[in-house]
Amino acid sequence: RAMPTSKNTITQKWATRLDAKGWDAALTPPLILGGYVYVASGQFIYKMDKNTGDIVQTSERMSGNMQYAMIPLAYAEGMLFAQIGGGQIQALSATTLKSLWISEKLGGQTLSPITYKNGYIYTGTWNSDTTPGSYFCLSVTDEDPSKGNEIKYCTWKYDHKGGFYWAGAYASENYLVFGSDDGAGDAYTSILYSVNTHTGQLIDKRTDLIGDIRSTITYNNGYVYFTTKGGYLYRVAMNADGTFGAVAGYNLGGAATSTPVVYKNRIYVGVCGTGGQYNADGGHHFDVLKESASGLSLAYKVSIPGYPQAAPILSTAYENQDFDGDGKADGRVYLYFTYNAYPGGIYMLTDTPGQTSGKAEELFRPVSKQQEYCISPLCVDKDGTIYYKNDSCYLMALETNGAYLDSVTARPDTGSVNWDKRFQASETEYTLRVA
């Protein structure tokens, strides 16, 4: 089924708030497995019914804390992988939510997304701009099923001064590509690495890049793509042996940590404005770029009242529809993304081949008690339901509903009615007083 396409037809299916206390007890972005949503908060993983938001199972206490919970849980081979701090990963059974193993303590924060490939997971640690962090590989095999606290040692690790922050990897059969921090926002000291997937041995590296690489590496049609805090989008050609080819860069005009989405020679990415990362009026924008064999260029950009810091989602559900009545499919795609400012909702952009301008629309605005900053990516199930969280510690499910109210009028027999808040379709409770 298709995702919601207007603020009138999107409705909140449910919203569940965990009993989080403090930023270090925030919940992770959601992970969908079958009919359930999995999130972690503090030292626990919660399995929730995705139709109701009810918690149906809670894990045993994990060995560490999920800390700021910016990275979702990862899943592979019947296991959930949680980043519990101290440079450690804890594996739990997705069925029983009991511990299977805990990786060796490397120190620092585990802030990079986990990548799985052929029985191994990969992620990185960050300590500070001036101290080393490690990118490391772990076998997911549970060598001793009789113990839940066995220590899993790294298959390999690769160290870099400045470490790895939000640096998700692309894994092929034989090489792994990931980026590093550089210790300075606009210096030529970050590195794009390609290492042997099995041994961690260096295959190639690029050092001519500006700014921290704080995005996951996207692969498409022989190229890898990523953004930097120095304000660049890069495209790097990949050779079959894991070495790098030609590099194309585009100056976005502001910092970017959003993982780029690449589709049919278009690239979609969120960009921080120059007026302050947390200032809603800071000049933030969402960019649509064109790519060709010769390089990258801007198709257009749209203003957003907040920094679109997380990866967008692209929907092709309506790509074959004819919206302009010319008898041909328009090729329209829909982009959905969050932004790191109040009220912490969702924006949407439509794009078609050759489009040179556009306007982002507010798709969903949380009710007041659910409003907060948001650095979370969106998660979508096969029914088109959107799941996400913001810093209010609410996990929300949003679906399409063709029936909606665009206004409500209350008329007393005498006097006048005062509403406690302005009517909006997403708000379900109001207090009315007759004066």
What annotation goes with each model-predicted range?
Residues 1-27, 31-70, 74-435:
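Extracytoplasmic/lumenal domain signature
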